Amino acid sequence: MANAASGMAVHDDCKLRFLELKAKRTHRFIVYKIEEKQKQVIVEKVGEPILTYEDFAASLPADECRYAIYDFDFVTAENCQKSKIFFIAWCPDVAKVRSKMIYASSKDRFKRELDGIQVELQATDPTEMDLDVLKSRVN
């Protein structure tokens, strides 16, 4: 089903991988890419549960936009182990203007396809999505 705003469809694999992350915890992160020629959002990369946040951050291109899901494990002040699912809209300042516009206009529709996102983060620079930022958003 294409998005009226940008004409982008969401590939079924996007939802399937998200459900695997959410329900089975078989992935630490998922990076999604818009394939403009095919007019759809696709899965670009899936990270194993053993991978670190640094591995995830390194998988995002420095000069291109992406959507990403990150399963963030943390310990509360009460010493409880918890997890939050982050949606990260990665849109670096140096990305092409057309790409930024397509990702911005498709974001809300894409997010609606992924039921279970708990925290949303938008980042134009790596410092806007470092571990300290994630930690501050879960409290």
Curated annotation (Swiss-Prot):
Its main location: cytoplasm. Keywords: Actin-binding, Cytoplasm, Cytoskeleton, Phosphoprotein, Plant defense. CDD domains: ADF_cofilin_like (cd11286). Disruption phenotype: Increased root length under light-grown conditions. Increased length of hypocotyls under dark-grown conditions. Altered architecture of the actin cytoskeleton in hypocotyl cells. Compromised resistance in response to Pseudomonas syringae pv tomato expressing AvrPphB. It comes from the Eukaryota. InterPro entries: ADF-H, ADF-H/Gelsolin-like_dom_sf, ADF/Cofilin. Gene3D superfamilies: Severin (3.40.20.10). The modification Phosphoserine is found at residue 6. It is found in: Cytoplasm, Cytoskeleton. Residues 5-139 form the ADF-H domain. Actin-depolymerizing protein. Severs actin filaments (F-actin) and binds to actin monomers. Contributes to the stochastic dynamic turnover of actin filaments. Binds monomeric actin (G-actin) with a marked preference for the ADP-loaded form and inhibits the rate of nucleotide exchange on G-actin. Involved in resistance triggered by the effector AvrPphB of Pseudomonas syringae pv tomato (Pst). May modulate the AvrPphB-RPS5-mediated defense signal transduction pathway. This is Actin-depolymerizing factor 4. It comes from Arabidopsis thaliana. The gene is ADF4.
